[in-house]
A protein has these predicted regions:
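Short conserved active-site loop signatures built around small residues
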Residues: 249
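Intrinsically disordered, low-complexity protein-interaction/activation regions
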Residues: 1-194, 198-207, 221, 225, ...
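A short glycine-centered flexible hinge/capping loop motif at secondary-structure junctions
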Residues: 238-246
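TPR/Sel1-like alpha-solenoid repeat signature
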Residues: 213-217
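Residues within the DNA-recognition helix of helix-turn-helix
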Residues: 83, 212, 229
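Amphipathic alpha-helical coiled-coil/heptad-repeat segments
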Residues: 167, 230-234
Length: 261
């Protein structure tokens, strides 16, 4: 639920436009999938996805240049006008235009990416916050959104690839932060272990993640599993990088063997 404050009073504002970016993209209007008339255009929805990602007003020139980058400027702007017409039912209340710049109304739109950023921007975020942020993800950023609009939209596809890389890095950083935070919160160790497992499934060569998982398992009283994780680390480093574990990892292994962790 969103709120606004006027004169010290708190007023509830109904969230009616939900936009999902962290996985297969979705737009729901008052709880129902958004269907545009007379044409349920993927490009029109891509405009909303772009604005939801940007989080700031964007010019018509920018939007036309992205989604019709292979077309002459005049034609691109003409196509953009047609797509914006399909979105006319959302204008003012959800889609705002001021001085030729378009943006989404934060008072009436709920965007999972904005919530992810809100939960992770605090450097002292608790494990529960970071876990909530990670549960917003259900796949690749804007998974499959380019289907049907790649033709003539090379710059949009390029932008999409950059965004995917950046937000995937943010997701993995959050997983690592969650695991680190869990070392200081014994009742959240299970969340940290799960985060390490997910990270290593994607990047088995990350030795620091293996160490973190070893420490978490040891703190959880799972000494045998912690030592087994060292073996998995050794195998992964040899397979992926052709190197043995570092002195730091070996020292942690010795500490666990001695019951010092």
């Amino acid at each position: 639920m969103l709120y606004s404050t006027h004169g010290g009073d708190r007023h509830i504002l109904k969230v009616v436009l939900d936009i999902t970016l962290l996985g297969p993209p979705q737009i729901n209007l008052e709880g129902q999938p958004l269907v545009l008339r007379p044409r349920n255009s993927a490009r029109a929805k891509a405009i909303l996805f772009y604005l939801a990602t940007s989080g700031r007003p964007e010019s018509r020139e920018r939007l036309a240049g992205l989604l019709w980058s292979d077309w002459p400027e005049k034609k691109a702007r003409e196509y953009l006008r047609g797509e914006l017409f399909l979105l006319s039912g959302l204008r003012q209340e959800y889609l705002v235009e001021v001085d030729g710049r378009l943006s989404l109304n934060p008072q009436t739109c709920r965007i999972d990416l904005a919530r992810f950023c809100e939960l992770t921007e605090d450097p002292h975020a608790m494990a529960e916050q970071l876990d909530e942020a990670l549960h917003l993800w259900s796949g690749t950023f804007l998974e499959g959104v380019e289907s049907g609009i790649e033709a003539g939209a090379a710059l949009f596809v390029e932008w999409l690839e950059t965004q995917r890389s950046g937000w995937e890095s943010a997701r993995r950083e959050t997983q690592y932060r969650l695991a680190e935070t869990a070392t200081h919160s014994l009742d959240r160790i299970d969340l940290g272990i799960a985060a390490c497992t997910q990270l290593l499934a994607d990047e088995p060569e990350r030795e620091e993640v293996h160490r973190l998982k070893m420490r978490l398992l040891a703190l959880a009283g799972q000494r045998t599993a912690a030592l087994k994780q060292y073996d998995q680390c050794t195998a992964a480093l040899l397979d992926e990088l052709g190197v043995p574990p570092s002195a730091e990892t070996n020292a942690l292994y010795d500490q666990i063997m001695a019951g010092e962790v």
